Curated annotation (Swiss-Prot):
Domain of life (superkingdom): Eukaryota
Ranges of Basic and acidic residues composition bias in the record: 13-23, 41-85, 92-109, 120-151
PANTHER family membership: DAUER UP-REGULATED-RELATED (PTHR47372), RE19971P (PTHR47372:SF11)
Protein name, UniProt field: Late embryogenesis abundant protein, group 3
Amino acid sequence: MASNQNQASYHAGETKARNEEKTGQVMGATKDKAGQTTEATKQKAGETTEATKQKAAETTEAAKQKASETAEATKQKAAEAKDKTAQTAQAAKEKTYETAQSAKERAAQGKDQTASTLGEKTEAAKQKAAETTEAARQKAAEATEAAKQKASETAQYTKESAVTGKDKTGSVLQQAGETVVNAVVGAKDAVANTLGMGGDNTITTKDNTTGATTKDTTTTTRNH
């Protein structure tokens, strides 16, 4: 009985020992595995950290390079824009100068043309005025000469008409006077003859042509 118990204890002890050994092995293996895992994890973490650090450095370097390139491009574009602005300003300045110069030249040409045209018009006006004045003077001279000629002709005609009229008037008056005298003498003679009277009768007449007074003496014989 005791022998069985001892054997059982022995077996239990072996089993326990084997279990403990196995457990120890397992634990050791687990510990080794855990250590390996931890080391691998540490190594992986280190590698990851290094990779991350390297990646960050690369990213930072790329960002710096990109920023530098961007800054350089911006600087270059700014310089190009500045040059373009300067060129545009210079072109505008030259264009403004050319426009002003052209306007100045056109104004000078217009002034010269205006002065020339004004001079020509003034000269033409002077010539026209001189021609008009000369024509008016000549016309006035012709009119004056014609008036003088007409006045001379009129005066001559009036003078001749006056002389002719005077001659005609004198002749008519003389004839009328003679007729009247003859009529008076005839009437006187008739009366004297009728009354048987006779005598001398003197009749005074005026010559209207010469203004002289004449006497007409008629002798009448009285019949006894």
